[in-house]
Regions:
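Conserved nucleotide-binding and Mg2+-coordinating catalytic segments in signaling enzymes
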Residues: 58-78, 99-112, 121
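Active-site-proximal alpha-helical element of nucleotidyl cyclase-like catalytic domains
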Residues: 115-136, 144, 163, 168
Length: 222
């Protein structure tokens, strides 16, 4: 019969050839097999596997913010449109929190732009661990972040906003030996059935964020 696929053949080598830990004279190769030749180990990947991994990485780069490694604005808008459609169909609640770092420009000016990047990454990393599977954390731009909370009413969203605010306020941040005190202001917006565009919900939360800043910063407003 005709053999198909990929095979490896040992041509009488001194040290032998091993596939996934087993010595072989001739053996078929399966995707992910580890091939040991002498002191060198190779991982066999099929062309289809490499191509799929390539496309997955390209897609990941398109939806993930490079600095903070959370979702970017593009994916945020796609996700929010889907969730608003679901809320309209099923009459479910949803809230959105938008927040930014208080006096972020002063952090950059006093400690340098690298410290600002460090602060953004640290905050994103801390919050990403608190986000549930059905929720979303995204960098909206600059030092602004958005949290989308499906199946969440206003009271619970405000409580979660307070958890974010308190957690960041006590976050021990230091860069190049300098301690960096950081607080955030947060605005909470609630979806209602009259909203037809995702920009309306974002604008509602953004107005609340403006009030939080106008009232002294380091607080949650709605």
């Amino acid at each position: 019969f005709i053999e198909t696929g990929w095979f490896i053949t040992d041509l009488g080598s001194t040290n032998g050839t091993y596939v996934s830990g087993h010595p072989v004279d001739r053996a078929p190769l399966r995707d992910g097999d580890l091939v040991k030749v002498g002191a060198t180990i190779f991982k066999f990947l099929s062309t289809e596997n490499i191509e799929a991994a390539f496309h997955e990485e390209i897609y990941r780069l398109a939806i993930i913010d490079g600095l903070t490694q959370v979702y970017n604005r593009r994916y945020l808008e796609e996700f929010l449109d889907r969730e608003m459609s679901r809320c309209r169909r099923h009459g479910r609640p949803m809230c959105l929190i938008i927040f930014d770092i208080d006096n972020f420009k002063q952090i950059n000016d006093q400690f340098g732009h690298l410290s600002g990047d460090y602060v953004l990454r640290s905050i994103a990393d801390k919050l990403n661990r608190r986000i549930r599977r059905e929720e979303l954390l995204a960098r909206y731009g600059g030092d602004e972040f958005v949290v989308i909370l499906p199946e969440t009413d206003l009271d619970d969203a405000i409580k979660f906003g307070e958890i974010i605010r308190e957690g960041i306020e006590i976050l021990p941040l230091s860069f190049d030996g300098w301690k960096i005190p950081v607080t955030v202001s947060l605005g909470v917006g609630r979806y209602n059935h009259k909203m037809t565009q995702s920009s309306e919900l974002i604008a509602s939360a953004d107005s609340a964020l403006y009030r939080a800043k106008a009232n002294g910063r380091n607080q949650v407003s709605n």
